Amino acid sequence: VLGSVAMLLGFLFLYRETGTFDFIELAEKGRDVSPLIFCAVLAGLWVKVPLAPLHIWQAPAYAAAPTPVTMLLTGVMSKMGVYGFLRIIVPIFPEQLKQHAGTLMAFALLTILWGAFLALRQTDLKRLLTFSSLNHVAYCVLGVGALGIAADGLKVDAHALATQGIILQMFAHGLAAAGLFYLVGLLEERTGLRGRNDFGGLSAVTPRFAAVFFILTFCSLGLPFMAGFAAEFLIFSGTFAVAPGVTVAATLGLLATAVFLLTMLQRVFTGPVNEQYKSMPDLTRNEILILTPIIILIFWAGIYPTTWLEFSQKLTQMIP
């Protein structure tokens, strides 16, 4: 709520100074508005993404929400914050973004590493995936910081790569994270539990469930031939051109992500079968129908990324 209030106040004062809500006119006049307006809009988006340290609402909200709501929050709502950076901050406040790009990248890096650290400590699968989401979406904001540095026109390739990477990462993570939360919801519905250490050997009991869970997790890990790989490769290519040190540091987040996600797979699906869950039902036909489009899109965007990059390039050209 506070983030929405800050953003609303920022928009109201932006109108007061410019006399318009038209994006084209704002792109011309936004360079000269009060820094407080930029800070208000930035604060609202900071909460919505979210970025550390304004992320404290996310884990309790995601953990307490019903599965469909959590899927909506991670698949759509968090991406609206990133969309706000691309659609509002980048075109309307380019000078302010350029001035504060380093700070934005620093907080994005902090969120990447802090999100991974928090995920490593979780045993509740829903909270673990929440902090994984915090970690992954921060890569998008890292790319936004790169756009600010590249906005002087000297890094045109970096600007295009980072923008396309951000768009593809929103798409890829939205699919994988929503699918994983759906599967954890099914697990909780079948067993009444969602602890990482409550299970074991489920791959032998529910092979279809395990196969889909592995695919979605590997997409989150950024394995080749999946959408997550193409997205992260583009973001890192764009950020490395303007901030190589920060980019190298951000790869530590990838290593930590591999640790907590692979540990999750090992604890839940491998080892001896828990006798309590030997009769646990596998995915039903309807559940497979829900998950199949997600899997198809993940591999499509990973194997044929040009299909999506041609589309996102048109969007990229609309952003100054």
Segments from the language model and where they lie:
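Predominantly late transmembrane helices and immediately cytosolic-facing juxtamembrane segments
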Residues: 52, 177-183, 247-279
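Residues that define the loop-to-transmembrane-helix transition and helix capping
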Residues: 68-69, 102, 126, 163-164, ...
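C-terminal ends of transmembrane helices
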Residues: 49-63, 113-132, 185-188
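Alpha-helical transmembrane segments and their helix-entry boundary regions
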Residues: 57, 67-72, 128-129, 165-166, ...
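Hydrophobic alpha-helical transmembrane segments of multi-pass membrane proteins
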Residues: 39-46, 73, 103-113, 167-172, ...
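Residue-level recognition of transmembrane alpha-helices
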Residues: 1, 75, 105, 129-133, ...
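Juxtamembrane/interfacial segments at transmembrane-helix boundaries in multi-pass membrane proteins
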Residues: 4-55, 60, 82-103, 146-164, ...
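Small-residue-rich segments of transmembrane alpha-helices in multi-pass membrane proteins
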Residues: 1-13, 67-83, 133-146, 206-213, ...
